[in-house]
């Protein structure tokens, strides 16, 4: 469409953001294991948004409402690097290989935070 600048203005700044192939709405299923409260099921819809050419940001476990987020970066071999975002502390991510399956458009993840009393999350996150 046509855009009109205010009288006396001669410049405009636009931000154009491209989405990567991992950007979208996902269904997450899995388990959040708390050291004292026990296990609880993860069964929810999550939105992951582009933050880089091969990276998306979304809710960590079921804690997005508390400000816990993660950045998933899909590497050339489809392994996934998980980095903390928001209020999320350092993550332990070496329980198993974390990876993305391009055939099913699914992330397979296992990670935890709080090394003294780990909160361990195991989840599959599939594009809807």
Placement of each model-derived feature along the sequence:
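Beta-sandwich strand segments
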Residues: 2-9
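Ser/Thr/Gly/Pro-rich, low-complexity flexible regions
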Residues: 11-128
């Amino acid at each position: 469409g046509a855009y009109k600048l205010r009288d006396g203005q001669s410049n405009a700044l636009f931000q154009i953001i491209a989405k990567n192939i991992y950007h979208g709405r996902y269904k997450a299923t899995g388990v959040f294991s708390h050291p004292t409260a026990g296990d609880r099921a993860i069964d929810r819809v999550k939105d992951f948004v582009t933050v880089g050419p091969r990276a998306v940001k979304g809710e960590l476990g079921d804690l997005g409402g508390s400000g816990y987020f993660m950045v998933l970066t899909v590497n050339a071999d489809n392994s996934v690097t998980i980095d903390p975002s928001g209020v999320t502390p350092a993550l332990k991510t070496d329980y198993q290989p974390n990876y993305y399956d391009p055939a099913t458009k699914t992330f397979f993840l296992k990670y935890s935070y709080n090394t003294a009393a780990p909160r361990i999350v195991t989840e599959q996150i599939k594009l809807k």
